[in-house]
């Protein structure tokens, strides 16, 4: 079943088409370090973008991090994601794995990634290999280092903005709203700065351009092949920073003299591209990334600007540290949500039947919404990625079994609600209130089950290795006596909708 694009997706696509139409056959200008105005433009238009060259990082940390990348690659722990973009399933050209705080997740392109946990204090984590455990510990060490560097960079940015307060241009009033760290740097700002750099996950990336001959061309500036298209990073705490450690494998690290006369960027060297969102006046930047370089996107840069990754000729790893927005994205969160639904189940029933305490519409509506959340945001997201996480750790096995057991109890709760709707003697008004409360969730459940089932059977899904093949789970056949309701809810939804229509005058 084809998903209807969201209003945000439609608006983004319309902006892109308008921009391409406006450009026609011309390229927008962009700058590289070879251009005289490159650093001036960076300072004026991209002041919240910071580059730390490899020489500023200790050799010991470089060695550990680069060995950790190779370890994760050697053990087959990086995977191309089967993502959903505008209703189409696509395999990302970049292979990834999420490492971070135990129980955290990170969602991008309608795909929820689950952390391979790093060893935070007080945790007891088992990895499948000692080398993988050591690699995760190294990325936690890198995380700590990048956090310190980010806090320092944010403090420097705040100090610069503070120093500029007294030099307000004549055309700007003193109370003109400022974008940035704020006009008064104080103790609260210090707390804010630390929270904006409190990285809880890193998304590891790997790509070998030699094995990806069909990479897209950058469409606006003519920057060449892209490993990652123009985007804002998703699912982050507002105004939080992003820190990236880049490691391109052995190859041409410097431009040769023969290339110095070429316009634009050197296609053999990896670059990160930046542009102001939907701005065709300001030149873009293409910043070369050499082995061990780090860059930082501070404050609201990720919201006001877009970035892309421009492929070089050699394989490249990166570790991208983020403050993932986890208010609805941790195991603790979803377990707490799942505890709400069973609170409506009576405990004094002797057999396996489920009896409900309340048929209040608001209570039933909340229960069905939680039912959908655990099924489609957690269980199906996890199993759609096959058994990939077992390559690194079994940390998620028990929690997923627990969530599935809670979900199964919710199926029984839904069944009890449907029995109540059919009960003879139930007042019509009360029946209609119940139907109105649950119908939207049941309709969404049916549509989403059909969509996820189709995605698992798609041609591209069938090409994946056995341990990465999507699994449509939970799934059961009609004759499965252990399940109170069918997998396919088409008939039930149709019947409920008909009852509601009949009741209307």
Swiss-Prot record:
Main location: nucleus
Residues carrying Phosphothreonine: 4
Keywords: Acetylation, Cytoplasm, Dioxygenase, Iron, Metal-binding, Nucleus, Oxidoreductase, Phosphoprotein
Mechanisms controlling activity: Activated by ascorbate. Inhibited by N-oxalylglycine, fumarate and succinate.
Record GO biological process: DNA alkylation repair; mRNA destabilization; regulation of multicellular organism growth; RNA repair
Compartments where found: Nucleus; Nucleus speckle; Cytoplasm
Protein name: Alpha-ketoglutarate-dependent dioxygenase FTO
Organism: Pongo abelii (Sumatran orangutan)
Gene designation per UniProt: FTO
């Amino acid at each position: 079943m084809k998903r209807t694009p969201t209003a945000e997706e439609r608006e983004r696509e319309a902006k892109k088409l308008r921009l391409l139409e406006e450009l026609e056959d011309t390229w927008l200008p962009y700058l590289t370090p070879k251009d005289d105005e490159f650093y001036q433009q960076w300072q004026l238009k991209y002041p919240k973008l910071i580059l730390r060259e490899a020489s500023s990082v200790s050799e010991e940390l470089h060695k550990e991090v680069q060995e950790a990348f190779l370890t994760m690659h050697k053990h087959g722990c990086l995977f191309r994601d089967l993502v959903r973009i505008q209703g189409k399933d696509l395999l990302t050209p970049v292979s990834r794995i999420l490492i971070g705080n135990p129980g955290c997740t990170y969602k991008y392109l309608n795909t929820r990634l689950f952390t391979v946990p790093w060893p935070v204090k007080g945790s007891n984590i088992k990895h499948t290999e000692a080398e993988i455990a050591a690699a995760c510990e190294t990325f936690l060490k890198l995380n700590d280092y990048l956090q310190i560097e980010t806090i320092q960079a944010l403090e420097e940015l705040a100090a610069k903005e503070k120093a500029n307060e007294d030099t307000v241009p004549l055309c700007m009033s003193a109370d003109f709203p400022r974008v940035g760290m704020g006009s008064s740097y104080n103790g609260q700002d210090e707390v804010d700065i630390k929270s904006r750099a409190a990285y809880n996950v890193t998304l590891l990336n790997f790509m070998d351009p030699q094995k990806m001959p069909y990479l897209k061309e950058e469409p606006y500036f003519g920057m060449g092949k892209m490993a990652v298209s123009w985007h804002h990073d998703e699912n982050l705490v507002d105004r939080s920073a992003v820190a990236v450690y880049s490691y391109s494998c052995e190859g041409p690290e410097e431009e040769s003299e023969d290339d110095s006369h070429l316009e634009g960027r050197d296609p053999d060297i990896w670059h990160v591209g930046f542009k102001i969102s939907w701005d065709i006046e300001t030149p873009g930047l293409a910043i070369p990334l050499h082995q061990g370089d780090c860059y930082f996107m501070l404050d609201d840069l990720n919201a006001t600007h877009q970035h892309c990754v421009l492929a070089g000729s050699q394989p490249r790893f990166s570790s991208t540290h983020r403050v993932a927005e986890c208010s609805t994205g941790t195991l603790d969160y979803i377990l707490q949500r799942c505890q709400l639904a069973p609170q409506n189940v009576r405990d004094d029933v002797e057999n396996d039947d489920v009896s409900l305490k309340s048929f209040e519409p608001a209570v039933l509506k909340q229960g069905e919404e939680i039912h959908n959340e655990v099924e489609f945001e957690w269980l199906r997201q996890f199993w759609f990625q096959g058994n990939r996480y077992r390559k690194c750790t079994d940390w998620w096995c028990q929690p997923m079994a627990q969530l599935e057991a809670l979900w199964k109890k919710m199926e029984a709760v839904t069944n009890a609600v449907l029995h109540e709707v059919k009960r003879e003697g139930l007042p019509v008004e009360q029946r209609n209130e119940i139907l109105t409360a649950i119908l939207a969730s049941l309709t969404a459940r049916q549509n989403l089950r059909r969509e996820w089932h189709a995605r698992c059977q798609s041609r591209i899904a069938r090409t994946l290795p056995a341990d990465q093949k999507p699994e449509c789970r939970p799934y059961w056949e009609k004759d499965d006596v252990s399940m109170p309701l069918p997998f396919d809810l088409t008939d039930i939804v149709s019947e409920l909708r008909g009852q509601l229509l009949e009741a209307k005058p």
